[in-house]
Design a protein with these regions (language model features):
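Extracytoplasmic/periplasmic substrate-recognition and gating elements
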Residues: 88, 253-256, 296-369
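Conserved C-terminal helix/tail region of periplasmic/extracytoplasmic solute-binding proteins
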Residues: 380, 387, 391-460
Length: 460
Protein backbone atom coordinates (compact mmCIF):
# COMPACT_ATOMS: atom_id res chain seq x y z
CA UNK A 1 0.00 0.00 0.00
CA UNK A 2 2.87 2.40 0.78
CA UNK A 3 4.29 1.86 -2.72
CA UNK A 4 0.93 2.52 -4.33
CA UNK A 5 0.39 5.63 -2.24
CA UNK A 6 3.82 6.94 -3.19
CA UNK A 7 3.10 6.37 -6.87
CA UNK A 8 -0.23 8.20 -6.62
CA UNK A 9 1.44 11.12 -4.83
CA UNK A 10 4.02 11.48 -7.58
CA UNK A 11 1.36 11.38 -10.26
CA UNK A 12 -0.67 14.03 -8.45
CA UNK A 13 2.43 16.23 -8.41
CA UNK A 14 2.73 15.63 -12.13
CA UNK A 15 -0.90 16.58 -12.56
CA UNK A 16 -0.52 19.94 -10.86
CA UNK A 17 2.92 21.03 -11.97
CA UNK A 18 4.19 19.17 -15.01
CA UNK A 19 3.77 20.95 -18.30
CA UNK A 20 7.17 20.66 -20.00
CA UNK A 21 8.39 23.39 -22.33
CA UNK A 22 6.35 26.23 -23.64
CA UNK A 23 2.99 27.54 -22.60
CA UNK A 24 0.16 25.45 -21.28
CA UNK A 25 -2.35 24.50 -23.93
CA UNK A 26 -6.06 24.04 -23.63
CA UNK A 27 -6.32 20.88 -21.54
CA UNK A 28 -9.49 21.17 -19.50
CA UNK A 29 -10.84 18.55 -17.05
CA UNK A 30 -14.35 19.71 -17.90
CA UNK A 31 -13.77 18.81 -21.55
CA UNK A 32 -11.38 15.82 -21.45
CA UNK A 33 -9.51 14.56 -24.50
CA UNK A 34 -9.39 10.84 -25.21
CA UNK A 35 -6.09 9.29 -26.26
CA UNK A 36 -5.72 5.87 -27.85
CA UNK A 37 -2.71 3.74 -26.92
CA UNK A 38 -1.41 0.60 -28.62
CA UNK A 39 0.88 -1.87 -26.87
CA UNK A 40 1.81 -5.51 -27.31
CA UNK A 41 2.13 -6.65 -23.71
CA UNK A 42 0.28 -9.80 -22.73
CA UNK A 43 -0.16 -11.91 -19.61
CA UNK A 44 1.26 -10.39 -16.45
CA UNK A 45 2.72 -7.54 -18.51
CA UNK A 46 -0.77 -6.59 -19.70
CA UNK A 47 -2.02 -6.65 -16.12
CA UNK A 48 0.78 -4.28 -15.14
CA UNK A 49 0.01 -1.98 -18.07
CA UNK A 50 -3.67 -1.96 -17.14
CA UNK A 51 -2.72 -0.87 -13.63
CA UNK A 52 -0.51 1.93 -14.97
CA UNK A 53 -3.33 3.13 -17.20
CA UNK A 54 -5.92 2.97 -14.42
CA UNK A 55 -3.64 4.91 -12.07
CA UNK A 56 -2.96 7.55 -14.71
CA UNK A 57 -6.64 7.98 -15.54
CA UNK A 58 -7.50 8.32 -11.85
CA UNK A 59 -4.79 10.91 -11.13
CA UNK A 60 -3.16 12.98 -13.87
CA UNK A 61 -5.93 12.15 -16.32
CA UNK A 62 -8.70 13.25 -13.99
CA UNK A 63 -6.90 16.43 -12.91
CA UNK A 64 -5.87 17.52 -16.41
CA UNK A 65 -8.72 16.18 -18.51
CA UNK A 66 -7.15 13.15 -20.21
CA UNK A 67 -8.75 9.75 -20.73
CA UNK A 68 -6.44 6.99 -21.90
CA UNK A 69 -8.03 4.19 -23.93
CA UNK A 70 -5.86 1.13 -24.53
CA UNK A 71 -5.73 -1.53 -27.24
CA UNK A 72 -3.51 -4.55 -26.60
CA UNK A 73 -2.29 -6.13 -29.82
CA UNK A 74 -0.88 -9.64 -29.71
CA UNK A 75 2.81 -9.56 -30.53
CA UNK A 76 5.29 -6.80 -31.22
CA UNK A 77 5.49 -7.79 -34.87
CA UNK A 78 1.74 -7.20 -35.29
CA UNK A 79 2.01 -3.69 -33.85
CA UNK A 80 4.91 -2.83 -36.13
CA UNK A 81 3.05 -4.30 -39.12
CA UNK A 82 -0.01 -2.16 -38.46
CA UNK A 83 2.11 0.95 -38.01
CA UNK A 84 3.94 0.18 -41.25
CA UNK A 85 0.59 -0.14 -43.04
CA UNK A 86 -0.40 3.27 -41.70
CA UNK A 87 2.88 4.80 -42.88
CA UNK A 88 2.41 3.28 -46.34
CA UNK A 89 -1.20 4.47 -46.56
CA UNK A 90 -2.37 0.94 -47.29
CA UNK A 91 -6.09 0.45 -47.95
CA UNK A 92 -7.64 -1.02 -44.84
CA UNK A 93 -4.90 0.31 -42.57
CA UNK A 94 -6.20 1.16 -39.08
CA UNK A 95 -6.34 4.71 -37.80
CA UNK A 96 -3.11 5.98 -36.30
CA UNK A 97 -3.22 5.73 -32.48
CA UNK A 98 -2.31 8.75 -30.38
CA UNK A 99 0.43 6.75 -28.66
CA UNK A 100 2.01 3.44 -29.54
CA UNK A 101 4.92 1.25 -28.63
CA UNK A 102 7.30 1.46 -31.57
CA UNK A 103 10.80 0.56 -32.69
CA UNK A 104 13.02 3.28 -34.18
CA UNK A 105 13.06 1.52 -37.57
CA UNK A 106 9.27 1.78 -37.77
CA UNK A 107 9.27 5.31 -36.39
CA UNK A 108 11.45 6.39 -39.31
CA UNK A 109 8.70 5.36 -41.74
CA UNK A 110 6.02 7.21 -39.77
CA UNK A 111 8.16 10.30 -39.35
CA UNK A 112 8.91 10.48 -43.09
CA UNK A 113 5.15 10.68 -43.71
CA UNK A 114 4.74 13.48 -41.17
CA UNK A 115 2.72 11.28 -38.84
CA UNK A 116 4.77 11.73 -35.66
CA UNK A 117 5.11 14.60 -33.22
CA UNK A 118 8.56 15.66 -32.08
CA UNK A 119 8.79 15.35 -28.31
CA UNK A 120 11.55 17.88 -27.69
CA UNK A 121 9.08 20.70 -27.16
CA UNK A 122 7.22 18.74 -24.48
CA UNK A 123 10.23 18.17 -22.20
CA UNK A 124 12.71 20.56 -20.64
CA UNK A 125 16.42 19.79 -20.89
CA UNK A 126 16.38 19.04 -17.18
CA UNK A 127 13.54 16.55 -17.60
CA UNK A 128 15.33 14.72 -20.43
CA UNK A 129 18.55 14.66 -18.43
CA UNK A 130 16.79 12.47 -15.87
CA UNK A 131 16.70 9.58 -18.37
CA UNK A 132 19.57 7.31 -19.36
CA UNK A 133 21.37 9.21 -22.14
CA UNK A 134 21.69 6.22 -24.47
CA UNK A 135 17.98 5.47 -24.15
CA UNK A 136 17.13 9.01 -25.21
CA UNK A 137 19.77 8.99 -27.93
CA UNK A 138 18.21 5.93 -29.55
CA UNK A 139 14.92 7.80 -29.89
CA UNK A 140 16.49 10.66 -31.83
CA UNK A 141 16.12 10.01 -35.54
CA UNK A 142 18.37 11.21 -38.37
CA UNK A 143 17.45 14.89 -37.94
CA UNK A 144 18.34 14.79 -34.24
CA UNK A 145 14.78 15.27 -33.01
CA UNK A 146 13.31 13.03 -30.32
CA UNK A 147 10.48 10.92 -31.70
CA UNK A 148 10.76 7.61 -29.78
CA UNK A 149 10.51 8.01 -26.03
CA UNK A 150 12.19 5.36 -23.81
CA UNK A 151 9.74 3.01 -22.15
CA UNK A 152 10.12 -0.78 -22.44
CA UNK A 153 13.91 -0.96 -22.65
CA UNK A 154 15.91 -4.13 -22.20
CA UNK A 155 19.35 -5.58 -22.72
CA UNK A 156 20.69 -9.12 -23.07
CA UNK A 157 22.05 -11.17 -20.17
CA UNK A 158 23.18 -14.73 -19.53
CA UNK A 159 20.54 -16.92 -17.88
CA UNK A 160 22.04 -19.95 -16.08
CA UNK A 161 20.17 -22.94 -14.65
CA UNK A 162 22.18 -22.95 -11.43
CA UNK A 163 20.80 -26.29 -10.25
CA UNK A 164 21.97 -28.21 -13.32
CA UNK A 165 25.17 -26.18 -13.59
CA UNK A 166 26.19 -27.09 -10.04
CA UNK A 167 26.30 -30.80 -10.95
CA UNK A 168 28.41 -30.09 -14.00
CA UNK A 169 30.70 -27.78 -12.04
CA UNK A 170 31.21 -30.28 -9.22
CA UNK A 171 32.22 -32.97 -11.70
CA UNK A 172 34.44 -30.89 -13.99
CA UNK A 173 35.60 -27.79 -12.12
CA UNK A 174 34.04 -25.40 -14.64
CA UNK A 175 33.04 -22.22 -12.79
CA UNK A 176 30.47 -19.50 -13.30
CA UNK A 177 33.34 -17.04 -13.61
CA UNK A 178 34.53 -18.84 -16.74
CA UNK A 179 31.22 -18.00 -18.41
CA UNK A 180 32.00 -14.28 -18.27
CA UNK A 181 33.80 -14.53 -21.63
CA UNK A 182 32.58 -16.04 -24.88
CA UNK A 183 35.79 -18.03 -25.11
CA UNK A 184 35.07 -19.54 -21.69
CA UNK A 185 31.46 -20.16 -22.63
CA UNK A 186 32.52 -21.92 -25.83
CA UNK A 187 34.94 -24.14 -23.91
CA UNK A 188 32.24 -24.96 -21.36
CA UNK A 189 29.93 -26.06 -24.19
CA UNK A 190 32.50 -28.57 -25.43
CA UNK A 191 33.28 -29.78 -21.91
CA UNK A 192 29.60 -30.23 -21.06
CA UNK A 193 28.96 -32.21 -24.23
CA UNK A 194 31.93 -34.44 -23.42
CA UNK A 195 30.86 -34.87 -19.79
CA UNK A 196 27.23 -35.71 -20.53
CA UNK A 197 28.28 -38.08 -23.29
CA UNK A 198 30.46 -39.90 -20.78
CA UNK A 199 27.52 -40.40 -18.41
CA UNK A 200 26.16 -43.02 -20.80
CA UNK A 201 29.21 -44.97 -22.02
CA UNK A 202 27.01 -47.56 -23.69
CA UNK A 203 25.42 -44.85 -25.89
CA UNK A 204 28.22 -42.90 -27.59
CA UNK A 205 27.55 -39.52 -29.15
CA UNK A 206 24.58 -38.57 -26.97
CA UNK A 207 26.16 -35.55 -25.30
CA UNK A 208 23.84 -32.67 -24.46
CA UNK A 209 23.62 -28.98 -25.25
CA UNK A 210 24.97 -26.42 -22.84
CA UNK A 211 24.23 -23.02 -24.38
CA UNK A 212 22.36 -21.17 -27.10
CA UNK A 213 21.85 -17.54 -28.08
CA UNK A 214 18.42 -16.14 -28.82
CA UNK A 215 19.99 -13.90 -31.45
CA UNK A 216 23.25 -14.72 -33.22
CA UNK A 217 22.91 -11.40 -35.03
CA UNK A 218 22.85 -9.47 -31.76
CA UNK A 219 25.81 -11.50 -30.53
CA UNK A 220 27.71 -10.56 -33.69
CA UNK A 221 26.81 -6.87 -33.42
CA UNK A 222 27.85 -6.61 -29.79
CA UNK A 223 30.85 -8.89 -30.18
CA UNK A 224 32.33 -6.72 -32.91
CA UNK A 225 31.79 -3.61 -30.77
CA UNK A 226 33.47 -5.31 -27.80
CA UNK A 227 36.45 -6.05 -30.05
CA UNK A 228 36.77 -2.40 -31.04
CA UNK A 229 35.22 -2.51 -34.48
CA UNK A 230 31.76 -2.68 -36.06
CA UNK A 231 29.68 -5.25 -37.90
CA UNK A 232 28.41 -2.68 -40.38
CA UNK A 233 29.77 -0.90 -43.41
CA UNK A 234 26.87 1.42 -44.17
CA UNK A 235 23.99 -0.97 -44.80
CA UNK A 236 26.24 -3.98 -45.49
CA UNK A 237 27.94 -6.42 -43.12
CA UNK A 238 31.71 -6.35 -42.57
CA UNK A 239 32.17 -10.09 -42.32
CA UNK A 240 35.66 -9.84 -43.82
CA UNK A 241 36.89 -7.93 -40.76
CA UNK A 242 39.50 -10.12 -38.97
CA UNK A 243 37.63 -9.63 -35.68
CA UNK A 244 34.58 -11.37 -37.10
CA UNK A 245 36.47 -14.65 -37.24
CA UNK A 246 36.57 -14.64 -33.43
CA UNK A 247 32.81 -14.03 -33.31
CA UNK A 248 32.30 -16.91 -35.73
CA UNK A 249 34.59 -19.40 -34.01
CA UNK A 250 33.20 -19.20 -30.46
CA UNK A 251 29.86 -20.44 -31.78
CA UNK A 252 30.93 -22.58 -34.73
CA UNK A 253 33.14 -25.00 -32.83
CA UNK A 254 30.62 -26.03 -30.12
CA UNK A 255 27.74 -25.92 -32.62
CA UNK A 256 29.50 -28.44 -34.85
CA UNK A 257 31.33 -30.56 -32.26
CA UNK A 258 28.51 -30.49 -29.71
CA UNK A 259 27.38 -28.37 -26.79
CA UNK A 260 25.76 -25.43 -28.59
CA UNK A 261 22.08 -25.77 -29.54
CA UNK A 262 21.47 -24.82 -33.17
CA UNK A 263 17.85 -23.95 -32.55
CA UNK A 264 15.40 -21.69 -34.36
CA UNK A 265 13.24 -20.70 -31.42
CA UNK A 266 13.31 -19.13 -27.98
CA UNK A 267 15.98 -20.43 -25.64
CA UNK A 268 13.54 -20.36 -22.72
CA UNK A 269 11.69 -23.29 -24.34
CA UNK A 270 14.87 -25.38 -24.17
CA UNK A 271 15.65 -24.19 -20.66
CA UNK A 272 12.21 -25.08 -19.32
CA UNK A 273 12.72 -28.67 -20.48
CA UNK A 274 16.28 -29.03 -19.18
CA UNK A 275 17.78 -29.27 -22.66
CA UNK A 276 20.27 -26.44 -22.07
CA UNK A 277 22.08 -25.02 -19.07
CA UNK A 278 22.36 -21.39 -20.12
CA UNK A 279 21.40 -18.89 -22.81
CA UNK A 280 21.78 -15.26 -23.77
CA UNK A 281 18.56 -13.37 -24.31
CA UNK A 282 16.51 -10.31 -23.44
CA UNK A 283 16.03 -9.36 -19.82
CA UNK A 284 12.30 -9.31 -20.58
CA UNK A 285 12.56 -13.07 -21.10
CA UNK A 286 12.90 -13.57 -17.34
CA UNK A 287 9.12 -13.85 -17.08
CA UNK A 288 9.30 -17.15 -19.00
CA UNK A 289 11.61 -18.77 -16.46
CA UNK A 290 9.91 -20.37 -13.50
CA UNK A 291 11.17 -22.45 -10.61
CA UNK A 292 11.02 -25.90 -12.18
CA UNK A 293 11.81 -27.75 -15.39
CA UNK A 294 9.81 -30.50 -17.06
CA UNK A 295 11.73 -33.25 -18.80
CA UNK A 296 10.56 -35.11 -21.90
CA UNK A 297 9.26 -37.98 -19.76
CA UNK A 298 7.03 -35.47 -17.89
CA UNK A 299 9.03 -35.68 -14.67
CA UNK A 300 9.74 -32.33 -13.04
CA UNK A 301 12.55 -30.90 -10.98
CA UNK A 302 12.71 -27.69 -8.94
CA UNK A 303 15.54 -25.42 -10.11
CA UNK A 304 17.09 -22.06 -9.40
CA UNK A 305 18.43 -19.61 -11.97
CA UNK A 306 21.35 -17.22 -11.89
CA UNK A 307 21.40 -14.09 -14.05
CA UNK A 308 24.81 -12.86 -15.22
CA UNK A 309 25.82 -9.86 -17.34
CA UNK A 310 26.25 -10.39 -21.07
CA UNK A 311 29.58 -12.14 -21.71
CA UNK A 312 32.47 -10.29 -23.31
CA UNK A 313 35.21 -11.44 -25.63
CA UNK A 314 38.56 -11.93 -23.92
CA UNK A 315 40.21 -8.52 -23.51
CA UNK A 316 37.14 -6.90 -25.03
CA UNK A 317 35.21 -3.89 -23.77
CA UNK A 318 32.14 -4.38 -21.59
CA UNK A 319 29.36 -3.58 -24.04
CA UNK A 320 25.78 -4.86 -24.08
CA UNK A 321 23.02 -4.29 -26.59
CA UNK A 322 20.18 -1.88 -26.00
CA UNK A 323 16.90 -3.57 -26.90
CA UNK A 324 13.18 -3.05 -26.46
CA UNK A 325 10.90 -0.37 -27.77
CA UNK A 326 9.81 3.12 -26.92
CA UNK A 327 6.64 5.08 -27.44
CA UNK A 328 5.76 7.45 -30.24
CA UNK A 329 3.16 10.22 -30.28
CA UNK A 330 0.98 10.90 -33.30
CA UNK A 331 1.09 14.36 -34.82
CA UNK A 332 -2.19 15.91 -33.76
CA UNK A 333 -3.63 18.91 -31.98
CA UNK A 334 -1.53 20.78 -29.39
CA UNK A 335 -3.89 19.53 -26.70
CA UNK A 336 -3.49 15.88 -27.65
CA UNK A 337 0.27 16.13 -28.04
CA UNK A 338 0.61 17.73 -24.61
CA UNK A 339 -1.70 15.10 -23.13
CA UNK A 340 0.36 12.31 -24.70
CA UNK A 341 3.55 13.79 -23.24
CA UNK A 342 1.94 13.78 -19.80
CA UNK A 343 1.19 10.08 -20.26
CA UNK A 344 4.85 9.42 -21.03
CA UNK A 345 5.97 11.42 -18.01
CA UNK A 346 3.51 9.60 -15.79
CA UNK A 347 4.45 6.13 -17.04
CA UNK A 348 8.18 6.76 -16.63
CA UNK A 349 8.16 8.54 -13.28
CA UNK A 350 10.49 6.42 -11.10
CA UNK A 351 7.78 4.87 -8.90
CA UNK A 352 5.56 3.97 -11.84
CA UNK A 353 8.51 2.84 -13.93
CA UNK A 354 9.67 0.51 -11.15
CA UNK A 355 6.18 -0.94 -10.93
CA UNK A 356 6.45 -1.84 -14.62
CA UNK A 357 10.02 -3.10 -14.27
CA UNK A 358 9.28 -5.24 -11.22
CA UNK A 359 6.92 -7.56 -13.08
CA UNK A 360 8.21 -7.49 -16.66
CA UNK A 361 12.00 -7.80 -16.72
CA UNK A 362 12.44 -4.49 -18.55
CA UNK A 363 15.00 -1.98 -17.34
CA UNK A 364 14.44 1.27 -15.46
CA UNK A 365 14.66 4.20 -17.86
CA UNK A 366 15.67 6.97 -15.45
CA UNK A 367 18.89 7.49 -13.52
CA UNK A 368 16.90 8.01 -10.32
CA UNK A 369 15.15 4.67 -10.68
CA UNK A 370 18.45 2.86 -11.25
CA UNK A 371 20.31 4.63 -8.48
CA UNK A 372 17.66 5.06 -5.81
CA UNK A 373 14.78 2.64 -6.41
CA UNK A 374 16.20 -0.71 -7.50
CA UNK A 375 17.51 -1.81 -4.10
CA UNK A 376 14.15 -1.12 -2.48
CA UNK A 377 12.41 -3.07 -5.24
CA UNK A 378 14.76 -6.02 -4.78
CA UNK A 379 13.90 -6.09 -1.08
CA UNK A 380 10.16 -5.82 -1.74
CA UNK A 381 9.84 -8.16 -4.73
CA UNK A 382 8.89 -11.75 -3.93
CA UNK A 383 10.07 -13.18 -7.27
CA UNK A 384 13.67 -14.43 -6.86
CA UNK A 385 14.28 -14.35 -10.61
CA UNK A 386 13.30 -10.67 -10.80
CA UNK A 387 15.48 -9.95 -7.76
CA UNK A 388 18.50 -11.54 -9.45
CA UNK A 389 17.75 -9.78 -12.72
CA UNK A 390 17.59 -6.38 -11.04
CA UNK A 391 20.92 -6.94 -9.28
CA UNK A 392 22.50 -7.79 -12.61
CA UNK A 393 20.80 -4.81 -14.26
CA UNK A 394 22.48 -2.51 -11.75
CA UNK A 395 25.85 -4.14 -12.48
CA UNK A 396 25.34 -3.63 -16.23
CA UNK A 397 24.27 -0.02 -15.63
CA UNK A 398 27.42 0.64 -13.60
CA UNK A 399 29.99 -1.28 -15.65
CA UNK A 400 28.79 -1.59 -19.25
CA UNK A 401 28.23 0.75 -22.16
CA UNK A 402 25.06 0.28 -24.18
CA UNK A 403 25.31 -0.36 -27.91
CA UNK A 404 22.57 1.07 -30.13
CA UNK A 405 21.93 -0.85 -33.38
CA UNK A 406 21.79 1.29 -36.53
CA UNK A 407 18.48 2.24 -38.13
CA UNK A 408 17.95 1.74 -41.86
CA UNK A 409 15.25 0.24 -44.06
CA UNK A 410 17.01 -3.07 -44.73
CA UNK A 411 18.03 -3.71 -41.13
CA UNK A 412 15.35 -6.29 -40.31
CA UNK A 413 15.87 -8.13 -43.60
CA UNK A 414 19.62 -8.13 -43.02
CA UNK A 415 19.19 -9.46 -39.50
CA UNK A 416 16.75 -12.17 -40.55
CA UNK A 417 18.93 -13.27 -43.45
CA UNK A 418 22.00 -13.49 -41.23
CA UNK A 419 20.20 -15.63 -38.64
CA UNK A 420 18.73 -18.00 -41.22
CA UNK A 421 21.96 -18.50 -43.16
CA UNK A 422 24.12 -18.83 -40.06
CA UNK A 423 21.86 -21.50 -38.58
CA UNK A 424 21.74 -23.33 -41.91
CA UNK A 425 25.53 -23.27 -42.24
CA UNK A 426 26.04 -24.58 -38.71
CA UNK A 427 23.36 -27.25 -39.03
CA UNK A 428 24.85 -28.54 -42.27
CA UNK A 429 28.35 -28.63 -40.81
CA UNK A 430 27.08 -30.49 -37.74
CA UNK A 431 25.53 -33.19 -39.92
CA UNK A 432 28.77 -33.60 -41.87
CA UNK A 433 30.78 -33.71 -38.67
CA UNK A 434 28.70 -36.54 -37.23
CA UNK A 435 29.25 -38.60 -40.36
CA UNK A 436 32.99 -37.89 -40.49
CA UNK A 437 33.50 -38.49 -36.77
CA UNK A 438 32.65 -42.14 -37.27
CA UNK A 439 36.00 -42.66 -39.00
CA UNK A 440 38.07 -39.60 -38.01
CA UNK A 441 39.43 -38.07 -34.84
CA UNK A 442 37.23 -35.18 -33.55
CA UNK A 443 39.56 -32.33 -34.60
CA UNK A 444 40.18 -33.89 -37.99
CA UNK A 445 36.45 -34.37 -38.50
CA UNK A 446 35.77 -30.77 -37.45
CA UNK A 447 38.31 -29.36 -39.89
CA UNK A 448 36.88 -31.45 -42.72
CA UNK A 449 33.26 -30.59 -41.89
CA UNK A 450 34.05 -26.87 -41.76
CA UNK A 451 36.15 -26.74 -44.90
CA UNK A 452 34.99 -23.74 -46.94
CA UNK A 453 31.98 -23.05 -44.67
CA UNK A 454 33.27 -19.79 -43.20
CA UNK A 455 34.51 -18.55 -46.57
CA UNK A 456 31.17 -19.31 -48.23
CA UNK A 457 29.24 -17.56 -45.45
CA UNK A 458 31.41 -14.45 -45.52
CA UNK A 459 31.19 -14.10 -49.31
CA UNK A 460 27.46 -14.81 -49.56
Amino acid sequence: MRRLAAAVCVLLILATGLSGCGERTGLDPKHPVTLTLWHNFGGTMQTTMDELVDTFNATVGRERGILLSVTSISGSASVQEKLTMIAAGDPGAPEMPDLSVCYPSTAVLLKEKGLLASLDGQFTAEELDAYLPRFVEEGRLSDGQLFVFPFAKSTEVLFVNQTLFNRFSAATGVTLESLSTFEGLSAACLRYYEWTDGLTPDVPGDGQWFYTADSLFNLAQVGMEQLGTTLFDGEALRLDDPAYRRVWDVIARPAVMGGYAVYDGYSSDLSKTGKIICSTGSTAGITFYGDQITYDDNTTEPVEYTVLPFPTFDQGEKIAIQRGNGMVVARSTPEKEEAAALVLKGFTAPEQNMKFVSSTGYLPVTKDAFENSVEAEIAANDNPNIQKLLRTAVKVYEEYNFYIPPVFDRFNALSGGYEEERLSALSGARSRYLELAETMAPEEAYDAAMEGVFEAFVSR
